[in-house]
Amino acid sequence: MAAKDVKFGNDARVKMLRGVNVLADAVKVTLGPKGRNVVLDKSFGAPVITKDGVSVAREIELEDKFENMGAQMVKEVASKANDSAGDGTTTATVLAQSIVNEGLKAVAAGMNPMDLKRGIDKAVVAAVEELKKLSVPCSDPKAIAQVGTISANSDETVGKLIAQAMDKVGKEGVITVEEGSGLQDELDVVEGMQFDRGYLSPYFVNKPESGTVELEHPFILLADKKISNIREMLPILESVAKAGKPLLIIAEDVEGEALATLVVNNMRGIVKVTAVKAPGFGDRRKAMLQDIAVLTAGTVISEEIGLELEKATLEDMGQAKRVVITKDATTIIDGVGNKSAINSRVAQINQQRDEATSDYDREKLQERVAKLAGGVAVIKVGAATEVEMKEKKARVEDALHATRAAVEEGVVAGGGVALIRVANAIRNLCGDNEDQNVGIKVARRAMEAPLRQIMANAGEEPSVIANNVRSGEGNTGYNAATEKYGNMIELGILDPTKVTRSALQYAASIAGLMITTECMVTELPKEDKPDLGNAGAGGNMGGMM
């Protein structure tokens, strides 16, 4: 076991504080409408330019191990805020830095660290309650666009795109961000249910100019099995041919003579038919087939529940207004499924998502909800260079997370105003003793830090603006972009309540732990000893002669 280096008391806290300040100072230059960029060097490729707090925090490793421990703990604040709300990482870092700096001053003055922490925790619990009272629901597209604009560093086109995407696919819909091919940002919406399986044979194509299959008002056969024997299919093919409608077969696989016969029938025009593989694998495939069945009012033909393909009738078929199939995707548009059945299926999947333990499972379940409930929107980010593309894509993703958080828990006045109002609302809060009261003051003072930092980045005098905002009422604040006072909600300067709440809670949690630290232990750096192996070998050879 390697030898350890141990530091106690003030020595440990001074080192830790230095690390906290190095990381926080690098992150906080990005805060606000006039925040600056940070350039990150990469071991390969071009440097990355970013205004995203968590991206900056993740890059920082300090040489001194004690300082690095302080930096890593603040990095945890940014990461937690990012994981919880998807934004607010810089605000969380600024709050944590302020609480740690003020808290350690109080500890140096002889306050009890445990009581300080209890006071800070008490203040944060009260502040979160006040924050909820200030929160305003965010549901109309204009407010959603404003939240997206603020989070994307005042980029209005991004805010509008996100609002359009949410309007198209609904609150439960999946919105993804991809790199586009042009200079302009684009929104691509896939309505209906789409899954990544294409036609099994190019001979099914009926729109050769686009290389797609388009079926109008088709019957949809869902089978949880491989189909290789055409005899099983004959009764249903005859029924579909008599009905004069096209048929889409979604099965585990269609192969051999079954596929060949379907292709021949399709080419001769006897029955218009297309076959695709079912999406997913194993249990997920069964679940997705059931989703399609609910969407199209069909039944999954599965031997597990005693249904056989030979005995299937038209009543077992699903139906949709239109189906479009490319070589690698199938889209079912306007399934005839019962709305209440679809809603109960969505509720069931939502419950599974809430109970899921892995992020991957949660993501897949959310995708299934989106496909049933609305659709999928893709925001394609346009930029002139790869460096700009990466920076812009990160901003759009942040803005998307912020708007989701806003829809979930509502919005409060932005620009650091909400935290100042909250700090004022809890001014009469008292602890059990004087040390706890100091902890409450530390937390209240920290709540001014985001506004002060926004002003410092804008080149204003933080103390003057903070005093003016503090003496104001309601949502009155200072717009650093236009350098004017006004009602932040009316000006469209909004912060999602969830983002502000998460930033405050995580900052206080980790800063409280740092204030109560009395000892730090790290490994001593190893000294690389010169390799004397070759010299020894030469000496031995000399002895042998």
Swiss-Prot record:
One of its GO terms (molecular function) is isomerase activity. InterPro entries: Chaperonin_Cpn60_CS, Cpn60/GroEL, Cpn60/GroEL/TCP-1, GroEL-like_apical_dom_sf, GROEL-like_equatorial_sf, TCP-1-like_intermed_sf. Residues 535-545 have a biased composition (Gly residues). One of its GO terms (biological process) is protein refolding. GO terms for cellular component: cytoplasm. Keywords: ATP-binding, Chaperone, Cytoplasm, Isomerase, Nucleotide-binding. Its EC number is 5.6.1.7. ATP binds at residues 30-33, 51, 87-91, 415, 479-481, 495. Coiled coil: none annotated. Gene3D superfamilies: GroEL, GroEL-like equatorial domain, TCP-1-like chaperonin intermediate domain. It catalyses: ATP + H2O + a folded polypeptide = ADP + phosphate + an unfolded polypeptide. Residues 526-545 are annotated as: Disordered. PROSITE patterns: CHAPERONINS_CPN60. Belongs to the chaperonin (HSP60) family. Forms a cylinder of 14 subunits composed of two heptameric rings stacked back-to-back. Interacts with the co-chaperonin GroES. Together with its co-chaperonin GroES, plays an essential role in assisting protein folding. The GroEL-GroES system forms a nano-cage that allows encapsulation of the non-native substrate proteins and provides a physical environment optimized to promote and accelerate protein folding. This is Chaperonin GroEL.
